[in-house]
Amino acid sequence: MSTPQLMQGMQKDLTCPLCLELFRAPVTPECGHTFCQGCLTGAPKNQDQNGSTPCPTCQTPSRPETLQINRQLEHLVQSFKQVPKGHCLEHLDPLSVYCEQDKELICGVCASLGKHKGHNIITAAEAYAKLKRQLPQQQVILQEARLKKEKTVAVLDRQVAEVQDTVSRFKGNVKHQLNAMRSYLSIMEASLSKEADNAEHTATEALLVERKTMGHYLDQLRQMDGVLKDVESQEQTEFLRKYCVVAARLNKILAESPPPGRLDIQLPIISDEFKFQVWRKMFRALMPALENLTFDPDTAQQNLVVFSDGKSVECSEQKQSVSDEPNRFDKSNCLVSKESFTEGEHYWEVLVEDKPRWALGVISETANRKGKLHASPSNGFWLIGCKEGKVYEAHTEQKEPRVLRVEGRPEKIGIYLSFSDGVVSFFDSSDEDNIKLLYTFNERFSGRLHPFFDVCWHDKGKNAQPLKIFYPPAEQL
């Protein structure tokens, strides 16, 4: 390597990458890169939880206490500074011209005799003016890049916060659900224990009565044993006289002998079926409290008649005189409830009974209510329905609804909505002790959701049965 190349390489190695000047009080982080002490301490930095700061060049974390001034390097810089500033390291002439090809400030000798010979050379003043004009453009490019990365960092920060919030809510939900399970199982344990204690008390009382009776009888037998021994010791005449009396008395006592005591204790059998029933009951106990919904007549299609209690709705052949509200369904025989939800868990039940055609579920605030409805999750509809009284369907993204396998004919449908879990589940809740899952939609919900009811066309009376929101009287809650 020639001396000029060596000097240029040394100058590069002795230059701070932050201020582009020769090192002043050079320090070297643990990663091995070197900076001016003032440049490094003044650089933007983000400390981690251990107090370490990232290297501006490679982002490797470094502990502040490891930063010591490199005295050897500092002395080398001082020696290098003996070359006059603004002079060529090779020829010691002033740096007076600029090589546009190599983008380098050089001296006149370099331009005429050195490696820059034949290149496009301009004066330093011309280069200064030219590059000065280009600087704003570079600043714009830098600003755009910085803003873009700042937006990316903001998005990442928001995603980190969302992840932390999601995990926090998940942990809270897990804790809440498991606490509810523990509470329910504790109540169930106490109930079964009390039932066992009652059975034990009843059986013990009965057995003690039986034992007392048996004790009295045993006393009579022991007494007769003594009498028989006394008769045995008598002379002939006295023996015969007493024996007949004693024998008759003994036969009477033996004839009145109480049957042996036996008592069956009736306790719950801890079988697989029992466990299954407990889990079913616990599942129902863990569901949110039943929502007390009411139909919203302002959203009902013209043929629908909402009963005065707000809990029943049916389809009539006659159109009602109603105003054309923006949120009213105009073609499909549908309506929503007055209540709507934006968060949390919710559960409500609808009596369909023997109605042969219906659809239930939730719709988004932005779902279309005019004209023909295209019921699918992508259009803001999460529904299941029944047709012909026997075909049950889930309105998925498929071209045709998904046919569900349903046992029997559900008379009451339970609908469970969880914003945090992104779930809409449908249950056959006809039997409270035997709730059966029909179908579940999994979705990431945003915005407001409305409980939805499609009464369907009355079909000349064949489908005139009403839909009813189920909510028991207060004394049954």
Swiss-Prot record:
Pfam families: PRY, SPRY, zf-B_box, zf-RING_UBOX. Zn(2+) 2 binds at residues 29, 31, 53, 56. Residues 272-476 form the B30.2/SPRY domain. Disulfide bond formation at Cys-244 occurs in case of membrane damage that cause the entry of the oxidized milieu of the extracellular space, resulting in homooligomerization. The keyword Coiled coil applies. It is found in: Cell membrane, Sarcolemma; Cytoplasmic vesicle membrane. This is Tripartite motif-containing protein 72. The lineage of its organism: Eukaryota, Metazoa, Chordata, Craniata, Vertebrata. Keywords: Cell membrane, Coiled coil, Cytoplasmic vesicle, Disulfide bond, Exocytosis, Membrane, Metal-binding, Transferase, Transport, Ubl conjugation pathway, Zinc, Zinc-finger. A zinc finger (B box-type) spans 83-124. The RING domain is flexible in both the dimer and oligomer. Binding to the negatively charged phosphatidylserine lipids is mediated by the positively charged PRYSPRY domains and is inhibited by Ca(2+). Residues 135-232 form a coiled coil. Specifically binds phosphatidylserine. The binding to phospholipids enhances ubiquitination activity. CDD domains: Bbox2_TRIM72_C-IV (cd19797), RING-HC_TRIM72_C-IV (cd16612), SPRY_PRY_TRIM72 (cd13742). GO terms for biological process: exocytosis; muscle organ development; muscle system process; plasma membrane repair; protein homooligomerization. GO terms for molecular function: phosphatidylserine binding; transferase activity; zinc ion binding. Muscle-specific E3 ubiquitin-protein ligase that plays a central role in cell membrane repair by nucleating the assembly of the repair machinery at injury sites. Acts as a sensor of oxidation: upon membrane damage, entry of extracellular oxidative environment results in disulfide bond formation and homooligomerization at the injury site. This oligomerization acts as a nucleation site for recruitment of TRIM72-containing vesicles to the injury site, leading to membrane patch formation. Probably acts upstream of the Ca(2+)-dependent membrane resealing process. GO terms for cellular component: cytoplasmic vesicle membrane; sarcolemma. Transmembrane segments: none annotated. It comes from Xenopus tropicalis (Western clawed frog).
